[in-house]
A protein has these predicted regions:
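Bacterial N-terminal signal peptides that target proteins for export
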Residues: 1-9
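Non-catalytic pre-domain segments flanking phosphatase-related domains
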Residues: 9-12, 19-78, 86, 100, ...
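Residues in and immediately flanking transmembrane alpha helices
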Residues: 15-16, 90
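Compositionally biased, intrinsically disordered low-complexity segments
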Residues: 17-18, 357
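C-terminal cap/substrate-recognition subdomain and adjoining C-terminal extension
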Residues: 29-39, 56, 65, 71, ...
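Electropositive phosphate-/nucleotide-binding environments in soluble metabolic enzymes
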Residues: 45, 149, 263
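A metal-dependent, Asp-based hydrolase signature
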Residues: 87-90, 94-176
Length: 360
C-alpha cells in the first residue's frame, strides 16, 4: 500500500497535479497593484495616464526603468494639492484669523503685530484687500507668537477642534474634511505599489500632521514650517546645556526656525528624507523647486504633477489665475491636473459649494 502511494505521488509530480495546476492558473489572473483600477473618482486624462504608465514602468522588475522599493519616494504639497485652500483661504490662515480676532481665550492677549497679520487675512477674505508683500513670512512670525506656550498635545487638540468646524463656502463639509477625493486615490495607488510618500508643506508641521492623520499618513512623514520647541522647565537655558527631566513636556516657542517654501522644501527633503524623490505633486510656485529637484533625479526616471484650481462650480476658483498657472506648468514640463476636467468629484457627492458668509 505504502509502495503504491509513493508511486502515485511520483506520477503526480511528473505529470503535474490538477490541484497544483489550478492554483497556478488562479495566481496568473491576479492583478498586479499597478494594473488594478484605483481611480474611480477620475476622468480619463493625460495626467492620470502618465502617472499610471510611470508606475507600471518603474515597478516592473523587467523594465529598464525599474526603481527598487526603497527608492520609490514621492512628495506632496498639502494646501491646494490634496487639502482645500479656498475656504476662503489656507487652513492655517483661517485658523490664525480665528485665534487672534475671535478666540476669547487669546484675542485680548495678542501682540499688535500678530493682530495686524490676522486683520490682514480678514480684510483679504472679506473685502478682497490684497495681502501685504511678503505675507508668507509675516504670517509665519505671527503664527509662531500666537501659539507660543502651547504644549504639543494642546496645539494638536486646537487644530483638530478648528478642523471640526463647518467650512465657510461649503455645505456638508468641515475644514478638516476638505480633502480632494481623487488625490486620496493617488495615495492608495502609490501605497499599493510600495511608494513611500511624504507631505512637504509650507504650513506648520503640526497642523499638517493633524490634517494628514485621518488619511493614514504617519507623523514622521510630514515636513512643514517649524518653530522651536523647548521643555516647559528649560527657561532661558540653551537646550545644549539643559537636561530634560522625566516629568517635563515640550511646548511651542515664538521662535520661527523655517518657512518651508520654494528651495527650503528641497533643503528639508535632503535633510529629513535623504533621497531625491521620483514623484512630486504640488499646485503653486512654492512647489516648483521641489518639482525641479525631483525632475533632476540623476539615478531614476521621475515625474512632477501640478493641480490647477480651475473649477468654479464645485469649488471657489479664480479662473484667470488658474489659466495663467496652467500655461506656466505646461511650459515647465509638469503634468497638469485640471480639477474641472479631470476630477469626477472634488470633495464627494454630499458636499455643495455655497457663497461665503461672514458675521456683520
Amino acid at each position: 500500500m505504502k509502495r503504491n502511494l509513493l508511486c502515485l505521488l511520483a506520477a503526480l509530480l511528473i505529470i503535474g497535479s490538477p490541484l497544483m495546476t489550478s492554483c497556478s492558473s488562479s495566481e496568473d489572473t491576479v492583478e498586479s497593484p499597478a494594473k488594478k483600477e484605483y481611480f474611480t473618482q477620475w476622468n480619463t486624462c493625460e495626467a492620470l495616464t502618465a502617472l499610471k504608465q510611470y508606475v507600471e514602468d518603474v515597478t516592473d522588475p523587467k523594465s529598464d526603468k525599474f526603481i527598487p522599493v526603497e527608492d520609490r519616494i514621492a512628495t506632496f504639497d498639502m494646501d491646494g494639492t490634496f487639502v482645500a485652500e479656498l475656504y476662503p483661504t489656507y487652513f492655517e490662515y483661517n485658523m490664525l484669523e480665528y485665534r487672534v480676532l475671535d478666540d476669547p481665550a487669546y484675542r485680548d492677549k495678542a501682540p499688535e503685530d500678530v493682530r495686524q497679520a490676522a486683520q490682514a487675512i480678514r480684510d483679504f477674505v472679506r473685502k478682497g484687500t490684497p495681502l501685504p508683500s511678503g505675507f508668507d513670512m509675516i504670517h509665519a512670525y505671527a503664527a509662531a507668537k500666537a501659539y507660543a506656550g502651547m504644549t504639543l498635545a494642546e496645539f494638536d487638540a486646537y487644530v483638530k477642534a478648528y478642523a471640526a468646524l463647518p467650512a465657510n463656502g461649503f455645505k456638508g463639509m468641515t475644514y478638516g474634511g476638505g480633502v480632494y477625493q481623487p488625490m486620496k486615490e493617488v495615495f492608495d495607488y502609490l501605497k499599493a505599489n510600495d511608494f513611500t510618500f511624504y507631505v512637504v508643506s509650507g504650513s506648520d508641521r503640526f497642523i499638517c500632521r493633524a490634517l494628514a492623520e485621518p488619511l493614514g499618513i504617519a507623523p514622521n512623514r510630514v515636513i512643514g514650517m517649524d518653530v522651536k520647541l523647548k521643555s516647559n522647565q528649560e527657561g532661558e537655558v540653551p537646550g545644549v546645556n539643559y537636561t530634560m527631566g522625566k516629568e517635563e513636556y515640550l511646548v511651542r516657542t515664538d521662535e520661527l526656525i523655517i518657512k518651508n517654501l520654494k528651495t527650503n522644501k528641497v533643503l528639508q527633503i535632503a535633510q529629513e528624507i535623504g533621497k531625491v524623490p521620483v514623484l512630486s505633486f504640488g499646485n503653486s510656485s512654492g512647489d516648483c523647486a521641489m518639482h525641479n529637484y525631483c525632475l533632476g533625479n540623476k539615478k531614476y526616471p521621475s515625474a512632477a504633477f501640478m493641480l490647477v484650481a480651475d473649477d468654479d462650480q464645485r469649488d471657489h476658483a479664480n479662473l484667470a489665475e488658474a489659466e495663467k498657472r496652467r500655461k506656466q506648468w505646461v511650459e515647465a514640463k509638469y503634468h497638469v491636473i485640471s480639477m474641472r476636467n479631470d476630477f469626477r468629484t472634488i470633495y464627494g457627492p454630499d458636499v455643495v459649494k455655497v457663497p461665503f458668509t461672514f458675521p456683520e
